[in-house]
């Protein structure tokens, strides 16, 4: 049996901008995408901590080290600069893979810099 499990998460990213007139997506600092094992154009789920909005879009890489998290297109209506968001990806795993699976989790500070990595960091 296959189960849908958390693959990766960027926790408490601060939205840096919203661009309603871009074609869509969420622009994410390329360094943070790599740390969280998120590929360009991969489907992502976004959870806005400030307003409760939850939506699906896809990731595009922004400049490495910039700390950018830009809501693009229709997603720009789901939040504003300064909002805290959680970005998650999911993948299907079989029972053998689940036994050894650990999601990639990147916890950010208020300036979108990594504080720590790993699920335990979010729980403490």
Swiss-Prot record:
InterPro entries cross-referenced by the UniProt entry = Asp_de-COase-like_dom_sf, Asp_decarbox
Q: Where does this polypeptide localize?
A: Cytoplasm
Q: Which reaction does it catalyse?
A: L-aspartate + H(+) = beta-alanine + CO2
Q: Indicate where the modification Pyruvic acid (Ser) is found in the sequence.
A: 25
Q: Does the keyword Cytoplasm apply?
A: yes
Q: Which cofactor does it need?
A: pyruvate
Instruction: List the molecular function annotations (GO) for this entry.
Output: aspartate 1-decarboxylase activity
A Pfam family per the record: Asp_decarbox
Active-site residue numbers: 25, 58
Q: Please outline how this chain is modified post-translation.
A: Is synthesized initially as an inactive proenzyme, which is activated by self-cleavage at a specific serine bond to produce a beta-subunit with a hydroxyl group at its C-terminus and an alpha-subunit with a pyruvoyl group at its N-terminus.
Keywords, alphabetical: Autocatalytic cleavage, Cytoplasm, Decarboxylase, Lyase, Pantothenate biosynthesis, Pyruvate, Schiff base, Zymogen
Q: How is the cofactor bound?
A: Binds 1 pyruvoyl group covalently per subunit.
UniProt keyword Cytoplasm, yes or no: yes
Query: Where substrate is bound, by residue?
Result: 57, 73-75
Recorded GO CC terms: cytosol
Q: In which pathway does it act?
A: Cofactor biosynthesis; (R)-pantothenate biosynthesis; beta-alanine from L-aspartate: step 1/1
The source's domain of life comes to Bacteria
Which SUPFAM superfamilies does the UniProt record give? ADC-like
Say which family it is in. Answer: Belongs to the PanD family.
What is this protein's function?
A: Catalyzes the pyruvoyl-dependent decarboxylation of aspartate to produce beta-alanine.
Quaternary structure and interacting proteins, as annotated: Heterooctamer of four alpha and four beta subunits.
The UniProt entry, under HAMAP family, shows: PanD
Any idea what this protein is called? Aspartate 1-decarboxylase
Q: What's the source species for this entry?
A: Syntrophobacter fumaroxidans (strain DSM 10017 / MPOB)
Tell me the lineage of the source organism.
Bacteria, Pseudomonadati, Thermodesulfobacteriota, Syntrophobacteria, Syntrophobacterales
């Amino acid at each position: 049996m296959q189960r849908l499990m958390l693959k990766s998460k960027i926790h408490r990213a601060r939205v840096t901008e919203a661009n309603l007139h871009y074609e869509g997506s969420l622009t994410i600092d390329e360094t943070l995408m790599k740390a969280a094992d998120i590929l360009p154009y991969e489907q992502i789920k976004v959870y806005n901590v400030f307003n409760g909005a939850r939506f699906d879009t896809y990731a595009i890489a922004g400049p490495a080290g910039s700390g950018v998290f830009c809501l693009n297109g229709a997603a720009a209506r789901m939040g504003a600069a300064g909002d805290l968001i959680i970005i998650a990806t999911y993948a299907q795993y079989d029972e053998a893979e689940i036994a050894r699976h650990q999601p990639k989790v990147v916890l950010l500070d208020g300036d979108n810099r990594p504080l720590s990595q790993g699920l335990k960091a979010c729980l403490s």
